[in-house]
Amino acid sequence: MAATTTTMMGMATTFVPKPQAPPMMAALPSNTGRSLFGLKTGSRGGRMTMAAYKVTLVTPTGNVEFQCPDDVYILDAAEEEGIDLPYSCRAGSCSSCAGKLKTGSLNQDDQSFLDDDQIDEGWVLTCAAYPVSDVTIETHKEEELTA
């Protein structure tokens, strides 16, 4: 490493070049075939894919079906499809959006209203439930849940 010294009337100043900082993050490979942050990369363009499941809602006016990603609440996905479902708090702390799970599996970890026994009986709050498989849910069940 080269240094330059300058003297002026008895004072000396030394200039040392600043070392180059290493790069903060190496580039990620485009497609390694391994999971990246829990998601798998695709074979074209390194796109990541997320699971989406078929949700069938049994409503008072008939059955409706739509696809719901595994990271979107069922109530939110239904609204995006133009399906009108009851709700109030949107936080899993009331029972306005209550339904009854008929088939499939859900993740309801974000809700705080239902107890474990109610979940085991199939009760679901659509505002705080993610699908983890294809599901069928009877909607508009608040009165039945709270009776």
UniProtKB/Swiss-Prot annotation:
Tagged with keyword Chaperone: no
Record-level GO cellular component terms: chloroplast stroma
Keyword Ribosomal protein appears in the UniProt entry: no
Subcellular location: Plastid, Chloroplast
GO terms for MF: 2 iron, 2 sulfur cluster binding; electron transfer activity; metal ion binding
Family annotation (CDD domains): fer2
Positions that bind [2Fe-2S] cluster: C89, C94, C97, C127
Pfam families named in the record: Fer2
Top-rank taxon, per record: Eukaryota
Cofactor binding: number and manner: Binds 1 [2Fe-2S] cluster.
This protein's UniProt keywords: 2Fe-2S, Chloroplast, Electron transport, Iron, Iron-sulfur, Metal-binding, Plastid, Transit peptide, Transport
BP-aspect Gene Ontology terms: electron transport chain
PROSITE patterns: 2FE2S_FER_1 (PS00197), 2FE2S_FER_2 (PS51085)
SUPFAM superfamilies: 2Fe-2S ferredoxin-like
InterPro entries: 2Fe-2S_ferredoxin-like_sf, 2Fe-2S_ferredoxin-type, 2Fe2S_fd_BS, Beta-grasp_dom_sf, Fd_pln
Residue ranges constituting the 2Fe-2S ferredoxin-type domain according to the UniProt record: 53-143
Cofactor entry: [2Fe-2S] cluster
Primary subcellular site in the record, as a coarse category: plastid
Presequence range in chain numbering: 1-50
PANTHER family found in the cross-reference section: FERREDOXIN, FERREDOXIN-2, CHLOROPLASTIC
Job of this protein: Ferredoxins are iron-sulfur proteins that transfer electrons in a wide variety of metabolic reactions.
Subunit structure: Forms a complex with heterodimeric ferredoxin-thioredoxin reductase (FTR) and thioredoxin.
Family statement drawn from the similarity comment of this UniProt entry: Belongs to the 2Fe2S plant-type ferredoxin family.
The protein's name in its UniProt record: Ferredoxin-1, chloroplastic
Organism: Spinacia oleracea
Gene: PETF
